[in-house]
């Protein structure tokens, strides 16, 4: 996985069936189990030690790599390796930060493994009344046939803006989440498992904790 600032083309559409029927808009989704709420994070802001311990607990759930040359940290979900091993699909977020800087970068990798060739150009996430559409940038999308595993694979990367991470919070509050991989008239629908949901929850939780922590607090959690 390359540590780069990736380009993206993302379109969000929020389908509200209740609204079309004249009903009120549904409330925003509740935080899933195991996810630290934003209110809880705000309460910890005055207690640096609590922030450090919360960060350590969140970091322990993901993969961590440090680049001494770039002085950067990369965090990614174990779900990607699991999906590759099982020849299945996943949405795998990854995060990177730089020593001494406040910015937190959040990317999403959509990975497909299956029997059909799908040169990805569009991805959809359906969860309840929410429908989010991702238009793949050819520069950050690829596909091929793996002769060793005997499966077709495809991958598309998106760099997400802070407001767009709310899309994940929204879908995590729904009972069923489906990702549709589409391209050149071919498509495949993948229903998220409990492991998929937990993996994304863990990464969103880590992102929220990193955003609210100072570079000094992050350093204590990562190097302490």
Language-model regions: role of each:
Residues 18-31:
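C-terminal segment of classical bacterial N-terminal signal peptides
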Residues 2-14:
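Bacterial N-terminal signal peptides that target proteins for export
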Residues 28-224:
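A generic "folded-domain core" signal
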